[in-house]
């Protein structure tokens, strides 16, 4: 999985920039911006790696001797490290604007390797800085820029903005039998739109979203003139893939979930977002169809979903009414999924360090 990065300016963003000469060249000029350390710790826990990138005009010249820079800078780095803030890299351009070098922000020379390796999660990486050149650097890198300001966008605000979840995924799956478009928003509720061409199946999918506490949009065009097999199976595959993508790095999720009574039915659902696909399914139906949905395809749907989502899923229901039995399975799965995808912290719920 690609890595989230924060490319952070130094003077005026991490530490205060002296208005007199814009140089932190003495220990008494070193002052940290408010809340910078606790917020950076929070962002590290959320999965971001930190890269410092700074223009230091004339560094190493008579007007800004290297030794004058090194003392305060090294102390700053020692303080960051002592508090658990770790920068993967510190990138410095020492040139003056008149030098017309190729490494001065907003040029991308210093960050070329992050762009070339394609290991950066561009959609979730940011440049943070107090100047227009920082925002221009972000534009040149194809990522988002955040203009730091103590009043309008301070470190507390940045921390809240970057750790607020809005987990989303979009999957398109086209085969000779089906054309499927699935969008999932795990942190939004309501207004789900589902059209598979199988009315009862639409109703069941809506139960997953409603009881799962999330929103999804599913559009399917399938070979229903034959039967509902490909439509149901491929929808399960596409939805499972979308849920897996929306979960992202899975940090902070509860991972596990559980049981649901419905009228005369008792449905049991146990779920582990483990990365290991497996289904145990036990349900018997009196009739071959409920509405326009084949009852034999219900197990096939959950098997397809568990395979692409990478989950261990146990489903079981008992009852007297086929409609209720089917609905209890989808409701129980939705309710269990609601528990499992809920974010309660920022650590990965696995002793292995991977899910």
From Swiss-Prot:
GO biological process: L-histidine biosynthetic process
HAMAP family (UniProt xref): Bifunc_HisB (MF_01022), HisB (MF_00076)
Catalytic activity: D-erythro-1-(imidazol-4-yl)glycerol 3-phosphate = 3-(imidazol-4-yl)-2-oxopropyl phosphate + H2O; L-histidinol phosphate + H2O = L-histidinol + phosphate
Protein name: Histidine biosynthesis bifunctional protein HisB
One GO MF term: histidinol-phosphatase activity
Annotated segments matching region Histidinol-phosphatase: 1-166
Binding residues annotated for Zn(2+), in chain numbering: 93, 95, 101, 103
PROSITE patterns: IGP_DEHYDRATASE_1 (PS00954), IGP_DEHYDRATASE_2 (PS00955)
Gene name in the database record: hisB
Cofactor(s) the record lists: Mg(2+); Zn(2+)
SUPFAM superfamilies, per the entry: HAD-like, Ribosomal protein S5 domain 2-like
CDD domains to which the protein is assigned, alphabetical: HAD_HisB-N, IGPD
GO CC field: cytoplasm
Biochemical pathway: Amino-acid biosynthesis; L-histidine biosynthesis; L-histidine from 5-phospho-alpha-D-ribose 1-diphosphate: step 6/9; Amino-acid biosynthesis; L-histidine biosynthesis; L-histidine from 5-phospho-alpha-D-ribose 1-diphosphate: step 8/9
NCBIfam families, sorted: HAD-SF-IIIA, hisB_Nterm, Histidinol-ppas, PRK00951.2-1, PRK00951.2-4, PRK05446.1
Residues the record marks as active site: 9, 11
Sequence similarity: In the N-terminal section; belongs to the histidinol-phosphatase family.
């Amino acid at each position: 999985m690609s890595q989230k990065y924060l490319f952070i300016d130094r003077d005026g963003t991490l530490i205060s920039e002296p208005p007199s000469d814009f140089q932190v060249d003495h220990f008494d000029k070193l002052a940290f911006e408010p809340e910078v350390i606790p917020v950076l710790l929070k962002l590290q826990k959320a999965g971001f790696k930190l890269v410092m990138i700074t223009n230091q005009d004339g560094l190493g010249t008579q007007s800004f001797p290297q030794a004058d820079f090194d003392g305060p800078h090294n102390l700053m780095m020692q303080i960051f490290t002592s508090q658990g803030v770790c920068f993967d890299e510190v990138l410095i351009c020492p040139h003056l604007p008149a030098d017309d070098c190729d490494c001065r922000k907003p040029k991308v020379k210093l960050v070329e390797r992050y762009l070339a390796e394609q290991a950066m999660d561009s959609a979730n990486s940011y440049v943070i800085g107090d100047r227009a050149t920082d925002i221009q650097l972000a534009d040149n890198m194809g990522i988002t820029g955040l203009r730091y300001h103590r009043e309008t966008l301070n470190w507390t605000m940045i921390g809240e903005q970057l750790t607020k979840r809005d987990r989303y995924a979009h999957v398109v799956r086209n085969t000779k039998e089906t054309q499927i478009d699935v969008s999932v928003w795990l942190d939004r509720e309501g207004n789900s739109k589902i059209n598979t061409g199988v009315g009862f199946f639409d109703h069941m999918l809506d139960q997953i979203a409603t009881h799962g506490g999330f929103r999804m949009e599913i559009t399917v065009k399938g070979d229903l003139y034959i039967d509902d097999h490909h439509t149901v199976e491929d929808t399960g595959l596409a939805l499972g893939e979308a849920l897996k993508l929306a979960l992202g790095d899975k940090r902070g999720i509860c991972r596990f979930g559980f049981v649901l009574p419905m009228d005369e039915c008792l449905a049991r659902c146990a779920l582990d977002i483990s990365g290991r696909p497996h289904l145990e399914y036990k349900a018997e139906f009196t009739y071959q169809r409920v509405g326009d949905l084949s009852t034999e395809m219900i197990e096939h749907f959950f098997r397809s979903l568990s395979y692409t989502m990478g989950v261990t899923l146990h489903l079981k229901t008992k009852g007297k009414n086929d409609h209720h039995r089917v609905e209890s399975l989808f409701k129980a799965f939705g309710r269990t999924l609601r528990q499992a995808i809920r974010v309660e912290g920022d650590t990965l719920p696995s002793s292995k360090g991977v899910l």
